[in-house]
Amino acid sequence: LEPNQLNLFPDVKATPPARTEGLVMSEAALLRWKSQIFDYQQRVRETKPVQQVTLFDLAPKHCDPDRIDPLFLRLVPMSFYRMPADSPGDACLYFVVDSAAGLLLYVGETCKSNQRWKGIHGCKDYIASYQDLHYRYGLQTAVNAAFWWDAPTDRRARQELELSLILKWRSPFNKENWQLWGQPFG
């Protein structure tokens, strides 16, 4: 209060609001969440895509999303972006995978593979929360990245491919799938 300001409530002492602890997913809920995602992604992996018949000979797409299985790409540690780089990098699709659980967690695209993760990336926080929760319950994780280098250099085509893979695999850290899987690590 200012020295000349009237105090309408002299007997009321200001107290900070009590902070409530954030809700923490139980171990059973975490395992159920992962199991549902795993089951869905396994069905995608095992189901042959429907071949659409055309009346005309159409040029095949540069990139067929049905030919990309992120769990079969070469994995690199999540610290890949801390490595020195002599160029901004190339256009690619990148995937965040928990190889211990066989889960695809995130799908992304970039035109600068060596720079995309150097700054702020919301997925870093999801990964940290995911790993922290597993650590709390003594559960193993192996979160890695994988890259698919045959991505289109055209931004729009690359983003269309990214979206088709996000929707196909229903990767839980992508915002497009939060309504489906929830957002327990956001």
Provide a role label for each language-model segment.
Residues 148-186:
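Structure-specific nucleic-acid interaction/processing domains
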Residues 32, 118-121, 172-173, 177:
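Generic N-terminal leader/processing signal
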Residues 94-96, 122, 165:
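Generic structural hydrophobic/aromatic packing signal, biased to beta-strands
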Residues 2-111, 156, 184-186:
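GIY-YIG nuclease catalytic motif and its immediate N-terminal context
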Residues 84-86, 112-159:
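Conserved short loop/helix modules at catalytic or binding sites
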